[in-house]
Amino acid sequence: MEIIHLSEIDSTNDYAKELAKEGKRNFIVLADKQNNGKGRWGRVWYSDEGGLYFSMVLDSKLYNPKVINLLVPICIIEVLKNYVDKELGLKFPNDIMVKVNDNYKKLGGILTELTDDYMIIGIGINVNNQIRNEIREIAISLKEITGKELDKVEILSNFLKTFESYLEKLKNKEIDDYEILKKYKKYSITIGKQVKILLSNNEIITGKVYDIDFDGIVLGTEKGIERIPSGICIHVR
């Protein structure tokens, strides 16, 4: 997969989107620093130097976006397990978490944008970057966990090898979509939790997460069972 490496940019997702609109597919935009990194619903994603920030563009007619959405975080977890000896997990919808002193802290996040023609998967991982004081309670870097600087290029390379290996197995029917879902659920730290889900219209839904499938989470609420496709998830207990 072609990699376009930039030292500094506002947003890898935005840059990738412009190229995707011109018809470019199956490439990565990698930046050493983002000045306007975006999280879910346009929230700020701090992207200081030292972190791994990249956006991957795939043809949405060639791949099932619902499967890719689950596969990407699985691949990140499987790669990062080689660098840290702590428990790693996925918080719905796509936060990469690590357990530190009985609490989970955020190691990275994923933002997916989808059209009929292409999908952009933006990935940010705290590797060697200094975590800002205002988010130190909830976020951590690999450097802080391991006590040493890690090779970001190696991490990206290992991610791509893992991701492309899974794609090949799916293509050859060595594994199916439901095996990907099963693996995602194995890493999930949201299933079984009491949560608050903030929706894009600012509505908050509270309930217990009974399951996760390709269409989101299955939530038990006061109204009964609801399926929530996406949202910002806060674990209550």
From Swiss-Prot:
PROSITE patterns: BPL_LPL_CATALYTIC (PS51733). It is an enzyme of class 6 (ligase). Keywords: ATP-binding, Biotin, Ligase, Nucleotide-binding. One of its GO terms (cellular component) is cytoplasm. Its EC number is 6.3.4.15. Gene3D superfamilies: 2.30.30.100, Bira Bifunctional Protein, Domain 2. GO terms for molecular function: ATP binding; biotin--[biotin carboxyl-carrier protein] ligase activity. Residues 1-191 form the BPL/LPL catalytic domain. It catalyses: biotin + L-lysyl-[protein] + ATP = N(6)-biotinyl-L-lysyl-[protein] + AMP + diphosphate + H(+). The keyword Ligase applies. GO terms for biological process: protein modification process. InterPro entries: aa-tRNA-synth_II/BPL/LPL (IPR045864), Biotin_CoA_COase_ligase (IPR004408), BPL_C (IPR003142), BPL_LPL_catalytic (IPR004143). It comes from the Archaea. Belongs to the biotin--protein ligase family. This is Putative biotin ligase.
